[in-house]
Amino acid sequence: MEKNKIHILVVDDDDRIRDLIKQYLNDNNFMVSSAISSADAKTKLSQFRFDLIVLDVMMPGQSGFELTKEIKNVMNVPIILLTAKGEVES
């Protein structure tokens, strides 16, 4: 891991979206790790320190909202939640 670079964890079950975000962040000189699920993200969070998490809301198993609550109970890291949903449900 390179020192002095902002380390971002990208969590998304969609390979295309995850790879697009990773590529953009890498191109802009950020250090990027990725996870394909909440379980994978928890493993990465136990191994590394992150400065920011970019997290998909709608994932199979544990949602991004549920994972956010868990993360916030144990660490103080900024989280950006993303969704591909185009409509608000009542």
Pin down the residues of each PLM region.
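Active-site residues of response regulator receiver
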Residues: 56, 83
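Acidic catalytic/metal-coordinating carboxylates
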Residues: 37, 63-66, 90
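Charged docking surfaces used in two-component/phosphorelay signaling
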Residues: 19-27
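The feature encodes the CheY-like receiver
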Residues: 18, 60, 87
